[in-house]
């Protein structure tokens, strides 16, 4: 019997931790090549032995055997699906009803949030918030969907009094990066961590003595190696994606947490500025 089928059939017997493992494996089957039991345990907040026992419960000798089998099943399933239905996004195909699509999208976003939140190192997060709060100037970089997340964060930070630059033009991003100074902060948003424009800006910022904060995936990347601090995001999206939907959901959860943390750090003054902003925008109606 195929392992994915075994997981579906045994779902009613799973414990809480086993259900976490099952959900993760199904949502991230296309990315399992780069996932070790140690990384998965950290991600889910459980022990490595729980993952090994889960694999053995399904009939595998250990996690490595289960992982390789799932990768093989995914490849075979993808080839079969290619011949019968068009992939529209992630696990969604042209054969799915709108009800099924809604459920799949909802679960994809839920998993992205759950797994991203499970990764938070709150002591490190506090240091990041303090670094941002003390920065005379903040630059936010990103491309595509990540740029939209960055733009949203920039508006929030400006609302509570921070000096922020978030330009869509990559030449302008590079120009701003080389003008940063010690004490300034660059927040680089890139799920892959390998976009040359974002990496170039991070290199320039670091050279100028600015603090580089990367919002990126767990995968080793040039951006991850350059950053002074990383905030990890997890997305179950596969190469079959029409848009970075759950990636954006995960990134927004991180940027929203940064914003609320900064508001909390200077709550009275921040809330006054938020109220003034609201009053001004109300006058425009």
UniProtKB/Swiss-Prot annotation:
DNA-binding region residue numbers: 37-56
Gene Ontology terms, MF aspect: carbohydrate derivative binding; DNA binding; DNA-binding transcription factor activity
GO biological process: carbohydrate derivative metabolic process; N-acetylmuramic acid catabolic process; negative regulation of DNA-templated transcription; regulation of carbohydrate catabolic process
Domain of life: Bacteria
Entry keyword annotation includes DNA-binding: yes
Keywords, comma-separated and alphabetical: Carbohydrate metabolism, DNA-binding, Repressor, Transcription, Transcription regulation
InterPro entries in the record: Homeodomain-like_sf, HTH_RpiR, RpiR-like, RpiR-like_SIS, SIS_dom, SIS_dom_sf, Tscrpt_reg_HTH_MurR, WH-like_DNA-bd_sf
Pathway noted in the entry: Amino-sugar metabolism; N-acetylmuramate degradation [regulation]
One Pfam family named in its UniProt record: SIS
Domain HTH rpiR-type: 1-77
Residue ranges of domain SIS in the record: 128-268
PANTHER family per UniProt: GLUCOKINASE, HTH-TYPE TRANSCRIPTIONAL REGULATOR MURR
Functional description taken from the UniProt entry: Represses the expression of the murPQ operon involved in the uptake and degradation of N-acetylmuramic acid (MurNAc). Binds to two adjacent inverted repeats within the operator region. MurNAc 6-phosphate, the substrate of MurQ, is the specific inducer that weakens binding of MurR to the operator.
Subunit structure: Homotetramer.
Protein's name according to its UniProt entry: HTH-type transcriptional regulator MurR
The species this protein was found in: Escherichia coli O17:K52:H18 (strain UMN026 / ExPEC)
């Amino acid at each position: 019997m195929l392992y994915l089928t075994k997981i579906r059939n045994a779902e009613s017997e799973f414990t809480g931790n086993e259900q976490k493992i099952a959900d993760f494996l199904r949502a991230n089957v296309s990315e399992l090549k780069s996932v070790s039991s140690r990384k998965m345990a950290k991600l889910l907040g459980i022990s490595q032995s729980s993952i090994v026992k889960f694999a053995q419960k399904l009939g595998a000798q250990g996690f490595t055997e289960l992982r390789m089998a799932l990768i093989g099943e995914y490849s075979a399933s993808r080839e079969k699906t290619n011949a019968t239905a068009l992939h529209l996004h992630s696990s969604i195909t042209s054969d799915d009803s709108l009800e099924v699509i809604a459920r799949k999208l909802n679960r994809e976003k839920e998993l992205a949030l759950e797994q991203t939140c499970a990764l938070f190192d709150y002591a490190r997060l506090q240091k990041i918030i303090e670094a941002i709060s003390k920065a005379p100037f903040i630059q936010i970089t990103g491309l595509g969907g990540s740029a939209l997340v960055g733009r949203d964060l920039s508006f929030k930070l400006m609302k509570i009094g921070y000096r922020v630059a978030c330009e869509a033009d990559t030449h302008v991003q590079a120009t701003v990066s080389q003008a940063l100074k010690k004490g300034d902060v660059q927040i680089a948003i890139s799920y892959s961590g390998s976009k040359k424009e974002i990496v170039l800006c991070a290199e320039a910022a670091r050279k100028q003595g600015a603090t580089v904060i990367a919002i990126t995936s767990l995968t080793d990347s040039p951006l991850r190696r350059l950053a002074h601090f990383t905030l990890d995001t997890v997305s179950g999206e596969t190469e079959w994606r029409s848009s970075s939907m759950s990636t954006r959901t995960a990134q927004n959860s991180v940027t929203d947490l940064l914003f609320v943390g900064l508001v909390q750090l200077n709550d009275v003054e921040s809330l006054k500025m938020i109220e003034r902003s609201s009053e001004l925008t109300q006058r425009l109606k």
